[in-house]
Structures are given as C-alpha cells and as structure tokens.
Amino acid sequence: MRKLLLSVTCAALMLAACNTPKEPVNPSVLAALDALPALVDSCGIPVLQYCYFSPQGELHGLVQAQDTTFDIPQPVTEESIFQAASLSKPVFAYIVMRMVDRGEIDLDRPVADYTDIERFEDKGMARRLTPRIVLSHQTGLPNWAAGPSSDEWPTSCITFKYPADSCFAYSGEGYAFLQRAVEAIQGAPLDEIARREVFEPFDMPTTSYDWQPAYDTLALVGFNRDGENRGQGRHPRANCAYTLRTNAREYARFIQHGLLNGEGLSDAAHKEMFQHQVHAQRYADEPRACDSSVFWCLGFGAVEEPSAGAGEYYWHWGDNGNFKALWLLHPGTKEGFVYLSNRATGHDLLDPFLKELTGEDLPLNDWIRN
C-alpha cells in the first residue's frame, strides 16, 4: 500500500506514515487526526502515538509538540515504547477469559481457591472475591494497599474500603490478587503467560509487562506537568494492573483481534466479556452526573452513546502519572482508536478530541479526572 503523510500544522510537527485505507475513512476521523497536532501542542504533550482502525483499514502515526524544551534522549518513532499504565488490565482480563474457556478457572469460584489470602486483614471477606468480581472492580478494595512499585507492597496488609460485591470500586490490588491465582494455575510468571496467550498470537513482539533490554533505547521518558523529565520509570516486578509497555499499533492489534473479533475466545466467553457487570459510579459515596452512562464489563468500561440507536463505546484509560493513555472501541462500526502519551498532561485533550472523533459528548474525561 502507498504511504500517506497526514497534514502538518504550524503548531506541531507530525511525523506520520499511514496505511491508506481501502475505502474512504469517515471524514470526522480524518478531521480529528488533522486536529491532533494543534491539540498536542496546546496541551504540551512531548509525544503522542496513535492508531485508528476500521473495516476500511488503518491510520497510525505519532505527533511531537513543537516545543523543543522537551529533551528526549531516545529516538522518537512509531516503534517507540510507552508505559500503557492501566491498559494493562484488559489484556489480563482477556487472558483470564481464555483460561475460563479451557476450564482452568471459574469466573464465579473464589479466587482464594487458587491462591493464598495471607495479605488480607479480613480473610472471610477475601474468600468472597471471584474473578468476575475482580475484573469488574467490585472487590471493595482500595486501588493499592501501598505503592505497587515500592519494596513494602508485596507484604503490605490489604484492607477493604467497602464490603465485597457491594459497589464499583476501582482496584489494581484486586487485579494483582487475581494475577497471583493465574500464575499459580499456569505455573509461570505473568509475562510468559501473556506472551503465549496474547503477544505472540497478535504480533506484539515489543509489548511486555516486564522490562526488556530493547527498552533501553525504545522506551520513552515521561514528563510531569512542570515539564520535568522523570525518566523511563522502570518497575521492579510485572503487574497485570499497570506495568504493560507497548506501542499504539501493537496494542491496537489486541483491541481489534482479541476484543472486537474475539479471536482466541469462544463465542460465549467473548459475549460475556462485553456484558455490563456493574454501574460504574466512580466514587461510591459521591454520585456524579458523568457516572450515569458508564458501566463496567469484564476488564474494561462501557459508555452509552448519547445518540439513540448507535450502540455503545467500550474503553479503558491509563494513568501512570507521567504517562497517559486511552483506547476506544465501537463494535457497531468496528472502529477502534488507541493513543499513548508521555506527559502528565496527556488527557488534557480528551474532550475536544473525542468530540471531533465520535461526534458525541462522551463523559469520559469528567469520569476519569473529576
């Protein structure tokens, strides 16, 4: 296929080589991508990497802010690697559903049947947690018992904020608990499992939950809101909730093939992943208007489309502080989009960009940030 260079605005430099789709792409998508350089520059995002796919083909590229004060020692290319943060979780959920298909784990059997619960203060409550409850964030646990990259975390005491299975409560700690069960069942570490179940089948050679030697030059540094270089941010251990590193094109393959098409899953497991499990009121004690149309499935969110009759969007965001990410999938049109960025301002463009991309006033920015 011939290469197409997307337009460059004076506000930012776009270095993009994109596969030309087989048929014309929705004009709103082209307009949204055309607006990215100005948005990236106005938000002060050093690098944003993206991939859009549809039945017509794929558009992918990266945008660099014109601001030259961002000193990035690594080469910036479409192969550059970013922290995907919580985009780690849907990949793990897909792995769990493959295990469900094989009868290796039961969605509604206690996770405690597969691994120990020694870190839990309330062991009776811990025994109520099932993979379904974990994947849909209904554990009642805090996000983390301690900083997950700290030396203290592996032995920290886990306490409940709410009763198990009583409300939506976003928790990386719950996912890490289920990770221990998956590793015990498989008799292998997380990244080895993920490579076999996801990365190799979907052609994701540079994606990993662990630090890889190639990341020394491929992994970009991240910047805080003050524009300070905070480094690549190496993590001490693989964690299914937040340590995934990838690039936009590789992650888009997972969304398209694993989630949209359900490749590697039975029809029943694929359908089950997309079922609403809980109304995702972000803060259990503080209902907000933006919560009303957001739900959680097995591993990712769903948001009802404001326009009647057009179906739902499915999504997940990632936030590791100085790295921000998001993906959006619309099964009705078989379109998907993912972006990765390397500054704490990486979500500042969400409202105008998603409005341009979808034509909808999706409440994702308010839900994530407020």
What are these regions (language model features)?
Residues L4-L13:
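Sec-dependent N-terminal signal peptides
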Residues L30-F82, E104, D151-I158:
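Short, conserved catalytic-motif segment at the N-terminal edge
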Residues H316, K324-R343:
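Short, well-ordered beta-strand elements
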Residues N19-V29:
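Bacterial Sec signal peptide processing site at the extreme N-terminus
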Residues L15-A17:
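C-terminal motif of bacterial Sec signal peptides marking the signal peptidase cleavage site
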